[in-house]
Regions:
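C-terminal, loop-rich substrate-recognition/catalytic regions characterized by aromatic stacking residues
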Residues: 1-329
């Protein structure tokens, strides 16, 4: 697990490991739910009751029969004026833009100690450096405070209407939770090179399944790669990696669009475009509805309070700071 020897960790009892025969162990394993989700990893207590923020224990867990979770809804929030996310496409459209520069932030968001301990220890050893994007290098959109706990399980997407000053542009989407206490928690990322925006229309793709609103699948073939048209907006869907996160009542959901880098602890993209920089514009309107789509699972409660900041493993938190988006006519 990469834990330092100074961190005393007691693992929970394995329900299968102590069964003496293979057949009996297999039968017991097959009786377990197929999907087990550990929420708020780092915010829980050990089997002995001890609790140190960042230790590898979940705040709570839930089990399900399959993934995607039955009953999952594709919940859409639309980009709007003044950096808001709304429930419907905005009545009045607009354009925001940012300078696309993959070196606007440090390439990674952690300190130098990423081996045993440090990143993998408890929160007292962390050296997160998750920084806010410099002015003009990102655009951001934030929802209204949530009226109920909103549990998101699975992949998602950010549907963007993009215009680029260069023939190609790399896009990074960052999803975070803006808490009522003024802190912001990182949740997940997604990336796409805009020239590779063509989505698969059948199951003949790398995942061998159909592309959906919650799991868009680019073809990633050379034949389908296409430069960005000069002076025109085109739809670019950025797939999001999986998340299992409860956005608690009163929190706001934030999506930030920027060039890649600055949001992962130990790796970054060494080859990015444009190089060194360009201008990416994002449109939002009735006819060009840029949006965030997340897989919301109804009826999944969050029985614990907000986790301490910091405490979640590989989900750094920081004081929230609003971004004033650049606007264009």
């Amino acid at each position: 697990m990469g834990l330092p020897q100074s961190d005393v960790v007691t693992l929970p009892v394995d329900p299968v490991q102590s069964i003496p025969t293979y057949d009996a162990a297999l039968a017991a394993f097959n009786q377990l739910p197929h999907v087990r989700l550990l929420f708020d990893s780092g915010a829980g207590a050990s089997p002995t009751g001890s609790s140190n923020p960042g230790d590898p224990y979940p705040g709570y867990e839930r089990s399900f029969s399959s993934l995607p979770i039955p009953g999952t809804n594709a919940r859409t929030w639309y980009f709007g004026p003044h950096g808001v996310l709304t429930n419907t496409p905005p009545a009045s459209g607009g354009i925001n833009w940012f300078s696309s520069n993959a070196h606007a932030l440090p390439l990674t968001d952690y300190g130098t100690n990423t081996g045993t301990g440090g990143l993998w220890g408890n929160a007292s050893q962390w050296q997160w450096k998750w920084l806010q994007s410099p002015s003009g290098t990102a655009v951001s959109y934030v929802s209204a405070p949530l009226m109920a706990n909103t549990t998101v399980i699975g992949s998602g997407a950010v549907d963007l209407w993009v215009r680029s000053s260069t023939p190609d542009v790399d896009l990074q989407a960052t999803i975070s939770e803006v808490r009522p206490d003024g802190n912001e928690t990182f949740v997940q990322n997604g990336w796409l090179r805009a020239s590779e925006r063509k989505l698969s229309t059948n199951s003949n793709n790398m995942f061998k399944r159909l592309s959906t609103a919650l799991e868009p699948i680019p073809t990633f073939t050379a034949a389908d790669a296409s430069p960005m048209p000069a002076g025109q907006f085109v739809k670019v869907v950025v797939p999001l990696y999986y998340e299992g996160h409860a956005y608690r009542v009163g929190s706001r959901i934030r999506v930030t669009i920027a060039a890649p880098n600055g949001t992962q602890p130990v790796w970054s993209f060494s080859q990015t475009t444009p190089n060194p920089s360009g201008v990416a514009s994002i449109a939002f309107s009735q006819s060009m509805p840029s949006s965030l789509v997340l897989p919301v699972v109804p009826g999944v409660s969050a029985p614990t309070p907000f986790p301490r900041c910091p405490s979640l493993r590989n989900e750094p938190c920081r004081p929230y700071r609003a971004i004033v988006n650049n606007t264009a006519q």
